[in-house]
């Protein structure tokens, strides 16, 4: 594997980009998560950033990447509708791991959005997608631009949903390299990592939540439900950040 040229790859059609990265991905699949991070820092261009929703297993990728690249900017897109426990979890992890947290929000406040558009999350798939565009996608795009990001780490795993089962370790999204170091981890591996390093799940995990986002589009897991059905009323899994 060798240093990759982001500009040259961005000039290719999407299908050709995937093919161009296929050999590299085949090699990355053989590496453990820490080696994937180290390889990326050596072979992919900076600036480097890590995104986190501070969800159920967030401590894993935050600890994993931050211990190899201390002070890496950690991007949080705050919708204003996170659970109180999530905000407390953010504070606790930021303090424990000494995170370089960068919080981005929509240009319109939550109250202003409701006045203008109503409760978008109650307006079907189109409403949810508009809500996500305003509160997740635009702030993330702004963060990547502000921080001059060229390589973006994220903690997605294939096991989490059907929409993630075929994701590679390395891809290009929003014009930057995107690296998923723990993409092939299962729930047991996550648990073992947390135990080994004295880290905790999100507080709501103990109350039956498998995935945590906004208060109005997250529900507890119940027997017979897939994890992805606990978000966005089962209408969709992704918030928009990891699509496209």
Swiss-Prot record:
Signal peptide (UniProt feature, chain positions): none
Q: Name one GO cellular component term.
A: cytoplasm
Which SUPFAM superfamilies is this protein grouped with?
A: Adenine nucleotide alpha hydrolases-like
Highest taxon of source:
Bacteria
Q: Which GO terms describe its molecular function?
A: phosphoadenylyl-sulfate reductase (thioredoxin) activity
The residues annotated as the active site are 239 (nucleophile)
User: What InterPro entries does the database record attribute to this sequence?
Assistant: PAPS/APS_Rdtase, PAPS_reduct_dom, PAPS_reductase_CysH, Rossmann-like_a/b/a_fold
This entry's Enzyme Commission designation comes to: 1.8.4.8
Q: Reaction catalysed?
A: [thioredoxin]-disulfide + sulfite + adenosine 3',5'-bisphosphate + 2 H(+) = [thioredoxin]-dithiol + 3'-phosphoadenylyl sulfate
Q: Does the keyword field hold Repeat?
A: no
Q: Which UniProt keywords apply?
A: Cytoplasm, Oxidoreductase
Q: Which Gene3D superfamilies match?
A: HUPs
Q: What pathway or pathways are given for this protein in its record? A: Sulfur metabolism; hydrogen sulfide biosynthesis; sulfite from sulfate: step 3/3
Oxidoreductase as UniProt keyword: yes
Subcellular locations according to the entry? Cytoplasm
NCBIfam families, per database record: cysH, PAPS_reductase, PRK02090.1
Q: What is this protein called?
A: Phosphoadenosine 5'-phosphosulfate reductase
Q: Which family does it belong to?
A: Belongs to the PAPS reductase family. CysH subfamily.
Biological role stated in the UniProt entry: Catalyzes the formation of sulfite from phosphoadenosine 5'-phosphosulfate (PAPS) using thioredoxin as an electron donor.
- What is one GO biological process annotated to this record? sulfate assimilation, phosphoadenylyl sulfate reduction by phosphoadenylyl-sulfate reductase (thioredoxin)
